[in-house]
Design a protein with these regions (language model features):
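Beta-propeller fold detector
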Residues: 30-37, 82-88, 138-145, 191-228, ...
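Blade-level signature of beta-propeller repeat domains, shared across WD40, Kelch, NHL, RCC1
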Residues: 343-385
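A short loop-to-beta-strand structural motif that recurs across blades of beta-propeller domains
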Residues: 70-73, 126-128, 178-181, 261-263, ...
Length: 385
């Protein structure tokens, strides 16, 4: 694709090396109907969100291992792919690794830059804002620095929730701690600055103040933490908080990747004080992990299972989990062109279709795709009761 700089994978973190288990066979509901083949260089598609104004899906393509800028792509109503915006690299690390993305009520796009997955775990991850003017992306602002491994991101009301996959930059022994940051949009108001226009001086919005968070749960923005044990696999999956989403009632859902669970967090009216939390499933369903997730209007949670190379849906009311689609790992190019899942990491709902990003952190073989699953005709109310 024009202006798209190719990159290749160099480094994989131990925490993302997979040791799949052979669980009891469960027949999936359906299978992907097609693949959206991405341009050369878009090796590791991940975060997705729907632009509320245009209906286009915005897709994050992180730079992993190599250095350079990263592209956000867009998928239109006919599933055509094109460039959306180029994210500049971190000035110190030389790369940018966008994972979770979401539009705010201000019309701007917020981005979790996971520098840890990109290659630098030393508290270099950031929260970014892609400023939009007249509906078009125009520039990037740095809002937060000091995060270890920013991952899933969601916005509810005036709050931005960001998953912190690990609080310690080192690979630690199990159990490991991870959690969630919460930021107020009001914290990132642009400051007026004096500018000269011809012979006159005036004021115009400048960049917002950059917030640097304290490490190891010391920052007041770090509102919730939990531990991952991965007891069933003897701690092989050292991945904690991952996907994140909220119901229309404001219940926060966080993926506990290694323990194969989803945690429900009940928040006070301020959106950041935790009242209670509980596991909505017991980790014994058909899934082998919980990666990126989305909460549908009915409250069901659709999620990617990276380890199991599958997509599932959970009813948080009763914990029932149903396998939607599943493929063998490391499919060949023919299968991928037909829509096969390939180490999927994120899902996105648009109409009756479920879009699944295949991050493919293992073999990294072309083509690089987003799988499309048709959900029409599936009675999830009956299946999940």
């Amino acid at each position: 694709m024009k202006n798209f700089e190719p990159f290749r994978i160099v480094v994989l973190f131990v925490s993302f090396v997979c040791f799949p288990l052979f669980a009891d066979a469960v027949e999936p509901l359906t299978k992907p109907v097609k693949a959206i083949v991405l341009p050369d260089g878009a090796l590791h598609p991940d975060g997705m969100t729907v632009n509320p104004k245009t209906g286009e899906i915005i897709l994050a393509v992180p730079v992993i291992g190599d250095k350079g800028n990263a592209w956000l792509l867009k998928i239109d109503a006919e599933d055509n792919v094109s460039n959306y915006f180029e994210l500049p690299a971190h000035p110190e690390t030389g790369r940018v690794t966008p994972l979770g993305i979401s539009f705010g009520p201000d019309g701007n796009l917020y981005v979790a830059d996971s520098q840890c997955l990109g290659g630098n775990p030393n508290h270099k991850s950031r929260l970014l804002r892609v400023v939009h003017e007249e509906g078009k992306p125009v520039r990037t602002e740095i809002l937060v620095t000091g995060i270890t491994q920013a991952n899933g991101l969601e916005i509810f009301g005036d709050k931005i929730y960001v998953a912190e996959t690990q609080i310690d930059p080192m690979i630690v022994e199990m159990p490991m701690t991870s959690g969630v940051f919460c930021f107020d949009l009001a914290e990132f108001k642009s400051e007026l600055q004096a500018v000269r226009r011809g012979r006159y001086r005036t004021h115009a919005p400048g960049p917002p103040p950059v917030l640097h968070v304290l490490p190891y749960q010391k920052d007041p923005h770090f509102i919730f933490s939990f531990q991952t044990t991965d007891a069933d696999r003897n701690g092989q999956q050292k991945v904690g908080a991952n996907g994140i989403g909220l119901s229309k009632e404001g219940l926060l859902y966080v993926a506990n990747f290694g323990d194969k669970k989803i945690i429900e967090v009940k928040l006070a009216k301020d959106g950041k004080t935790v009242i209670s939390n509980r596991d909505v499933n017991d980790g014994k369903g058909p899934n082998e992990s919980v990666d990126g997730l989305k909460v549908c209007p009915k409250g069901y949670i659709f999620f990617a299972d990276y380890v199991g190379n599958a997509v599932c849906v959970t009813n948080p009311a009763n914990g029932k989990t149903v396998l939607i689609a599943k493929n063998p790992t490391n499919p060949n190019s023919e299968a991928k062109n037909a829509g096969a899942l390939d180490r999927c990491s994120e899902v996105c709902l648009r109409g009756t279709k479920l879009y699944v990003a295949n991050i493919d952190l293992e073999d990294n073989n072309a083509p690089h795709t987003v799988s499309v699953i048709d959900l029409s005709g599936i009675d999830f109310d009956a299946l999940l009761k």
